[in-house]
Amino acid sequence: MLKLTKIFRDEFGHTDKNFAQHFLVNDHYLNEIAEALEVSEGTNIVEIGPGCGALTLKFLEKGAHVTAVEIDKKLVDFLERYLFFYDNLEIIHDDFLNIDKYQLPPRFSFAGNLPYNLSTKILMKTTAFHSCIDKMVFMFQKEVASRINAVPNTKDYSWISVISQYFFDIKKIRNIAGGNFWPKTKVNSTVLLFTPRKRYFQNSNIENEFLEMVKKSFVTKRKTLKNNLKNDIADIENILEELFANKSIRAEQISLKGFITLYERIYT
Protein backbone atom coordinates (compact mmCIF):
# COMPACT_ATOMS: atom_id res chain seq x y z
CA MET A 1 0.00 0.00 0.00
CA LEU A 2 1.26 3.47 -0.84
CA LYS A 3 2.47 5.42 2.20
CA LEU A 4 1.45 8.75 0.75
CA THR A 5 2.08 10.91 3.80
CA LYS A 6 5.61 9.51 4.16
CA ILE A 7 6.27 10.05 0.45
CA PHE A 8 5.05 13.65 0.70
CA ARG A 9 7.11 14.31 3.83
CA ASP A 10 10.26 12.84 2.23
CA GLU A 11 9.68 14.88 -0.93
CA PHE A 12 8.70 18.27 0.53
CA GLY A 13 9.66 18.14 4.22
CA HIS A 14 6.79 20.35 5.42
CA THR A 15 3.18 21.34 4.82
CA ASP A 16 1.90 24.76 3.77
CA LYS A 17 1.10 26.87 6.85
CA ASN A 18 -1.02 29.20 4.69
CA PHE A 19 -3.56 26.37 4.34
CA ALA A 20 -3.25 25.18 7.98
CA GLN A 21 -2.40 21.66 6.79
CA HIS A 22 -2.22 18.80 9.29
CA PHE A 23 -2.53 15.29 7.86
CA LEU A 24 -3.99 12.38 9.86
CA VAL A 25 -1.39 9.58 9.89
CA ASN A 26 -2.98 7.02 12.23
CA ASP A 27 -4.10 4.20 9.94
CA HIS A 28 -6.63 2.85 12.43
CA TYR A 29 -8.46 6.18 12.55
CA LEU A 30 -8.36 6.52 8.76
CA ASN A 31 -10.03 3.11 8.48
CA GLU A 32 -12.61 4.09 11.10
CA ILE A 33 -13.59 7.19 9.11
CA ALA A 34 -13.95 5.16 5.90
CA GLU A 35 -16.07 2.58 7.74
CA ALA A 36 -18.35 5.27 9.21
CA LEU A 37 -19.34 6.24 5.66
CA GLU A 38 -20.07 2.57 4.77
CA VAL A 39 -18.03 2.91 1.60
CA SER A 40 -18.38 0.15 -0.98
CA GLU A 41 -18.04 -0.41 -4.72
CA GLY A 42 -19.63 2.51 -6.60
CA THR A 43 -20.17 4.79 -3.59
CA ASN A 44 -19.74 8.46 -4.50
CA ILE A 45 -17.48 10.34 -2.08
CA VAL A 46 -16.74 14.06 -2.21
CA GLU A 47 -13.61 14.65 -0.15
CA ILE A 48 -12.94 18.21 0.94
CA GLY A 49 -9.21 18.83 1.28
CA PRO A 50 -7.76 15.37 0.53
CA GLY A 51 -4.27 16.50 1.50
CA CYS A 52 -1.71 13.98 0.37
CA GLY A 53 -4.39 11.33 -0.13
CA ALA A 54 -4.16 8.92 2.82
CA LEU A 55 -7.95 8.83 3.32
CA THR A 56 -8.58 9.19 -0.41
CA LEU A 57 -6.67 5.96 -0.98
CA LYS A 58 -8.85 4.11 1.55
CA PHE A 59 -11.94 5.12 -0.42
CA LEU A 60 -10.41 4.28 -3.80
CA GLU A 61 -9.33 0.81 -2.67
CA LYS A 62 -12.91 0.07 -1.62
CA GLY A 63 -14.07 0.89 -5.15
CA ALA A 64 -15.67 4.25 -4.38
CA HIS A 65 -15.72 7.05 -6.93
CA VAL A 66 -13.93 9.95 -5.26
CA THR A 67 -14.27 13.60 -6.21
CA ALA A 68 -11.45 15.32 -4.34
CA VAL A 69 -11.63 19.11 -3.97
CA GLU A 70 -8.21 20.58 -3.17
CA ILE A 71 -7.17 24.24 -3.12
CA ASP A 72 -3.39 23.66 -2.91
CA LYS A 73 -1.81 23.24 -6.37
CA LYS A 74 1.18 21.41 -4.90
CA LEU A 75 -1.12 18.76 -3.43
CA VAL A 76 -3.15 18.52 -6.63
CA ASP A 77 0.05 17.80 -8.57
CA PHE A 78 1.15 15.29 -5.92
CA LEU A 79 -2.16 13.38 -6.06
CA GLU A 80 -2.14 13.37 -9.86
CA ARG A 81 1.37 11.89 -9.88
CA TYR A 82 0.81 9.15 -7.31
CA LEU A 83 -2.84 8.23 -7.88
CA PHE A 84 -3.03 8.62 -11.67
CA PHE A 85 -3.78 4.89 -12.17
CA TYR A 86 -7.13 5.13 -10.33
CA ASP A 87 -9.83 5.84 -12.90
CA ASN A 88 -12.36 6.26 -10.06
CA LEU A 89 -10.69 9.49 -8.92
CA GLU A 90 -11.53 13.01 -10.07
CA ILE A 91 -9.56 15.94 -8.68
CA ILE A 92 -10.96 19.47 -8.69
CA HIS A 93 -8.40 22.22 -8.09
CA ASP A 94 -10.52 24.85 -6.33
CA ASP A 95 -11.67 26.24 -3.00
CA PHE A 96 -14.64 24.14 -1.83
CA LEU A 97 -16.45 27.35 -0.91
CA ASN A 98 -16.63 28.11 -4.66
CA ILE A 99 -18.02 24.72 -5.69
CA ASP A 100 -21.48 24.42 -7.31
CA LYS A 101 -23.86 21.47 -7.48
CA TYR A 102 -23.21 20.81 -11.17
CA GLN A 103 -19.56 19.96 -10.37
CA LEU A 104 -20.52 17.08 -8.05
CA PRO A 105 -22.35 13.75 -8.49
CA PRO A 106 -26.16 13.70 -8.13
CA ARG A 107 -25.84 11.80 -4.80
CA PHE A 108 -22.77 11.42 -2.60
CA SER A 109 -21.28 11.42 0.88
CA PHE A 110 -18.93 14.13 2.12
CA ALA A 111 -15.67 13.45 3.94
CA GLY A 112 -12.83 15.64 5.12
CA ASN A 113 -10.38 16.75 7.77
CA LEU A 114 -11.51 20.37 7.70
CA PRO A 115 -9.08 23.27 8.22
CA TYR A 116 -9.80 24.63 11.68
CA ASN A 117 -10.07 28.25 10.57
CA LEU A 118 -12.69 27.48 7.89
CA SER A 119 -14.58 24.51 9.31
CA THR A 120 -17.75 26.40 10.26
CA LYS A 121 -17.96 28.10 6.85
CA ILE A 122 -17.45 24.76 5.10
CA LEU A 123 -20.10 23.05 7.23
CA MET A 124 -22.62 25.79 6.42
CA LYS A 125 -21.71 25.50 2.71
CA THR A 126 -22.59 21.79 2.77
CA THR A 127 -26.20 22.66 3.61
CA ALA A 128 -26.55 23.94 0.03
CA PHE A 129 -26.11 20.30 -1.09
CA HIS A 130 -28.48 18.89 1.55
CA SER A 131 -30.80 17.11 -0.92
CA CYS A 132 -27.82 15.32 -2.54
CA ILE A 133 -26.10 14.05 0.62
CA ASP A 134 -26.23 10.49 1.97
CA LYS A 135 -23.86 11.05 4.91
CA MET A 136 -20.97 13.27 5.98
CA VAL A 137 -17.96 12.51 8.15
CA PHE A 138 -15.84 15.52 9.09
CA MET A 139 -13.03 16.15 11.53
CA PHE A 140 -13.11 19.40 13.50
CA GLN A 141 -11.13 21.01 16.26
CA LYS A 142 -12.58 19.45 19.41
CA GLU A 143 -13.99 22.74 20.71
CA VAL A 144 -15.78 23.44 17.41
CA ALA A 145 -17.26 19.92 17.35
CA SER A 146 -18.56 20.48 20.89
CA ARG A 147 -20.41 23.61 19.71
CA ILE A 148 -21.86 21.84 16.68
CA ASN A 149 -23.21 18.97 18.79
CA ALA A 150 -24.18 20.99 21.89
CA VAL A 151 -27.59 20.89 23.58
CA PRO A 152 -29.54 23.77 25.17
CA ASN A 153 -28.49 25.13 28.56
CA THR A 154 -24.81 24.35 28.02
CA LYS A 155 -21.96 26.80 27.49
CA ASP A 156 -21.21 25.47 23.98
CA TYR A 157 -24.77 25.86 22.65
CA SER A 158 -24.91 28.51 19.90
CA TRP A 159 -26.42 29.32 16.52
CA ILE A 160 -24.09 26.77 14.90
CA SER A 161 -25.62 24.07 17.15
CA VAL A 162 -29.19 24.98 16.18
CA ILE A 163 -28.54 25.31 12.45
CA SER A 164 -26.39 22.17 12.20
CA GLN A 165 -29.03 20.14 14.04
CA TYR A 166 -31.79 21.61 11.88
CA PHE A 167 -30.17 20.04 8.81
CA PHE A 168 -28.53 16.92 10.28
CA ASP A 169 -28.67 14.26 12.95
CA ILE A 170 -25.17 14.34 14.43
CA LYS A 171 -23.20 11.57 16.13
CA LYS A 172 -19.75 11.78 17.67
CA ILE A 173 -17.42 9.08 16.32
CA ARG A 174 -14.32 9.78 18.40
CA ASN A 175 -11.77 12.27 19.68
CA ILE A 176 -8.28 12.22 18.15
CA ALA A 177 -5.21 13.54 19.95
CA GLY A 178 -2.83 15.95 18.22
CA GLY A 179 -0.01 13.39 18.07
CA ASN A 180 -1.89 11.43 15.38
CA PHE A 181 -1.24 14.15 12.79
CA TRP A 182 1.72 15.33 10.77
CA PRO A 183 2.68 17.94 11.71
CA LYS A 184 1.36 17.39 15.24
CA THR A 185 -1.47 19.70 16.25
CA LYS A 186 -1.52 21.65 19.50
CA VAL A 187 -5.21 20.87 19.97
CA ASN A 188 -7.30 17.71 19.85
CA SER A 189 -9.81 16.91 17.11
CA THR A 190 -13.22 15.24 16.99
CA VAL A 191 -14.79 13.20 14.18
CA LEU A 192 -18.53 13.73 13.67
CA LEU A 193 -21.00 11.77 11.54
CA PHE A 194 -23.84 13.78 9.96
CA THR A 195 -27.01 12.21 8.55
CA PRO A 196 -29.41 14.57 6.71
CA ARG A 197 -32.74 15.23 8.39
CA LYS A 198 -35.99 16.13 6.67
CA ARG A 199 -36.03 19.92 6.54
CA TYR A 200 -38.95 21.43 8.45
CA PHE A 201 -39.35 24.40 6.10
CA GLN A 202 -39.68 23.38 2.45
CA ASN A 203 -39.82 26.94 1.12
CA SER A 204 -36.24 28.22 0.79
CA ASN A 205 -37.16 31.86 1.48
CA ILE A 206 -38.94 30.93 4.70
CA GLU A 207 -36.08 28.64 5.69
CA ASN A 208 -33.49 31.37 5.12
CA GLU A 209 -35.57 33.80 7.19
CA PHE A 210 -35.72 31.23 10.00
CA LEU A 211 -31.95 30.64 9.90
CA GLU A 212 -31.32 34.39 10.00
CA MET A 213 -33.57 34.70 13.05
CA VAL A 214 -31.57 31.97 14.80
CA LYS A 215 -28.28 33.78 14.11
CA LYS A 216 -29.68 37.08 15.38
CA SER A 217 -30.90 35.35 18.53
CA PHE A 218 -27.30 34.56 19.49
CA VAL A 219 -25.67 37.77 18.23
CA THR A 220 -24.90 38.91 21.79
CA LYS A 221 -24.90 35.81 23.95
CA ARG A 222 -25.03 37.61 27.30
CA LYS A 223 -28.19 39.48 26.30
CA THR A 224 -31.70 38.11 26.63
CA LEU A 225 -33.51 37.00 23.51
CA LYS A 226 -35.86 39.98 23.65
CA ASN A 227 -32.87 42.35 23.51
CA ASN A 228 -31.36 40.54 20.54
CA LEU A 229 -34.63 40.53 18.57
CA LYS A 230 -36.42 43.67 19.75
CA ASN A 231 -35.31 45.75 16.73
CA ASP A 232 -36.97 43.25 14.36
CA ILE A 233 -40.00 42.14 16.36
CA ALA A 234 -42.06 44.80 18.13
CA ASP A 235 -44.09 42.44 20.34
CA ILE A 236 -41.23 40.07 21.22
CA GLU A 237 -41.62 40.38 25.01
CA ASN A 238 -45.26 39.25 24.98
CA ILE A 239 -44.53 36.45 22.51
CA LEU A 240 -41.73 35.05 24.71
CA GLU A 241 -44.00 35.18 27.74
CA GLU A 242 -46.74 33.38 25.79
CA LEU A 243 -44.49 30.61 24.39
CA PHE A 244 -41.94 30.07 27.15
CA ALA A 245 -43.52 31.73 30.22
CA ASN A 246 -40.30 33.71 30.48
CA LYS A 247 -39.89 37.09 28.81
CA SER A 248 -36.23 37.17 29.90
CA ILE A 249 -35.29 33.83 28.33
CA ARG A 250 -31.90 33.60 26.59
CA ALA A 251 -31.22 31.98 23.22
CA GLU A 252 -29.08 29.22 24.76
CA GLN A 253 -32.15 28.03 26.71
CA ILE A 254 -34.23 27.34 23.59
CA SER A 255 -34.19 24.06 21.67
CA LEU A 256 -34.39 23.68 17.89
CA LYS A 257 -38.09 22.87 18.25
CA GLY A 258 -38.51 25.99 20.38
CA PHE A 259 -36.91 28.18 17.72
CA ILE A 260 -39.21 26.70 15.06
CA THR A 261 -42.24 27.41 17.27
CA LEU A 262 -40.99 30.96 17.88
CA TYR A 263 -40.50 31.60 14.17
CA GLU A 264 -43.96 30.30 13.27
CA ARG A 265 -45.55 32.41 16.00
CA ILE A 266 -43.81 35.57 14.76
CA TYR A 267 -43.86 35.21 10.99
CA THR A 268 -46.73 32.92 10.01
Where are the regions that the model predicts?
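Catalytic cores of RNA-modifying enzymes
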Residues: 1-212, 216, 252, 257-265
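C-terminal lobe and adjacent flexible extensions of AdoMet/dcAdoMet transferase-like proteins
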Residues: 196, 214-268
